[in-house]
């Protein structure tokens, strides 16, 4: 039975039971900001279940398009390497909105599976929530499923209702028990029944889940019976198709085989079992349906997820040898397969192909260079024996060559390498901060204005009255702004400082008799024309109105503290590090100061402390700040510091604060004591020869110090020592750790030797050579290597594969003694085993390594080594 027939039969069956066939909703959730993509059949009925929406039917059935490739539900990294992970899938479902309940839902499911689909009853197993006696009795007494095949699933670790068989929409709201139906693939496949220690195997596969919403959970965790219980069910079309078509992997069903053959045609790959073909076949579905539903590739949100999926598919095509756009040519094959069920896909076919082609061509323009960098880094790592890919390099690939992190991680995973995600995130955060600072309210020079200049009074006062000279909305001049309008106001007089010299623009309020305007930022439209950017909170504003302008005094004061301390810090850095220190950039806002400066080496803790001491000494001196306007020549003669490359006018403003004297047009404290306290919170490099310091002042510095004190006190409490003894105690602990690590290494070496002796007896003779494939409990890669070397010495002429499992990942190592490498290659052997456990690997003829993500298949993979070796000896 083909997938299309299964879909049709499911919908028609429930239609015959009084259900309304409802079209799939869009993959972009409607009015639900909590969801990135539609990921379940019940999403479109969420408000119906919550009682916020009413439908003209009380029973419904759907085949819902779903995507899981971002956020909490993210299957992307597993796609192509397991039998059942997909980015796009179809969820068949039937729903009851206060109509039928457990009896009918269970009866319908059993009738469809056993009578309509013809599944053998003895192949079906069932789970129910441990306390759901009603469902248990229906299954055992009415349906007649033997009690040994109906399994009660309890709460995880005793936490009430924390069970795989109890569904909750959230911490509060509708919830209830569920019953799941499993298909038994037979004893030839490893795995145990649900609830057993081996339940993660592939023998018993869940095909249908029936959720019974019968309670409403309140904030106290109390369950209240719902007056009209409901039913929400879901059955993956791909999973049930695999069962009905008598195949074990979803990728073997007719729907996927069509797309896999199409991908093979376009890439020239002859191996239809290639994981890369599976990736491409899966991803063309997700990408095409997302584009058809209005998502376009971008750099954030849904668009970024789409771009990641497209580029992952392209990378796998590149891996198979494609060097030009190929992915978009699969769209007609997909439309032929799925267009009849989803007319929106057929209607959008041309647009889908066009969007994919453009994205492909854009990425193919850079992928060659990006892959070269990636391969060079991996080769260098292999030489050095490193297993962690540099996060900065991963970010360069992302930023320069368009390689999303998960694409780089995907390539690394194939080599059993992990990416330093923390370093990547740090690089990303730095770039975002730079972009935010550079692009915030960029309205300068892009608004057309002809009129008087703005007179700035913000050095003397925070309040001023001014007349509206111009108004802008959506970048165009207007005569008035209405309540709720976002726009820009130009005044003839203002106390608001416009962003300049690294200091952010002021925020505050413009108030008139007819309306109030909240100023969110202030920027210069022209050199002496100030634009107040914000929103009309109440009433209206019109050109010619007189307004009272008031700056947010607290924000201005915080900004002034941070700006003034930046001058003092600059001076202190030159004293501590040398006269070569020059400002390369700054960003001053109410929260902190960020200062970039020329220097080649990281600051030592002692240098940071010295800078802090110098600045805080200036603060304690409480010296008055003096600002004077003078000619540029007089400023130079006075010794005022000027920034290299900066253009100055004939007249400049010179700020003297403490021992610092610089040209500056910003706002500052009246006395150094107003700064209160200065603390450096971070120091690091941002470019070759450029360092960055971030610092806080005043109340923010006090809060920072208090937080550090709290942390030290917490650590001292954990260590049961006084705060001033923490460092000594940690040093002692580290000494113990190092000693234990050395002892562990010695024990592992002894373990390898002892295991090697035990494993020798397990080797079997095949045509004059010894063949051994075994798993070592608790071993790491180093132990596997050491054990392999010892076994090769002991067995003399041998073919060996050793494996270990840790944190759900498989590590493999293969070895072939030198007398056999003409016939057998360790790289080919380890790759054969790795492919069976969801991985890939390679290496030298005599020794090779690999990794995998599917430990469930490891026993069978190891068992295949003997036959592989026998065929080649």
From Swiss-Prot:
Domain of life, per lineage: Bacteria
Obligatory cofactor(s): Zn(2+)
One family name in Pfam for this protein: DHHA1
Subcellular location: Cytoplasm
Matching PANTHER family: ALANINE--TRNA LIGASE, CYTOPLASMIC, ALANYL-TRNA SYNTHETASE
UniProt record similarity statement: Belongs to the class-II aminoacyl-tRNA synthetase family.
Note on domains (UniProt): Consists of three domains; the N-terminal catalytic domain, the editing domain and the C-terminal C-Ala domain. The editing domain removes incorrectly charged amino acids, while the C-Ala domain, along with tRNA(Ala), serves as a bridge to cooperatively bring together the editing and aminoacylation centers thus stimulating deacylation of misacylated tRNAs.
Protein name from the UniProt record: Alanine--tRNA ligase
Provenance organism: Aromatoleum aromaticum (strain DSM 19018 / LMG 30748 / EbN1) (Azoarcus sp. (strain EbN1))
Gene: alaS
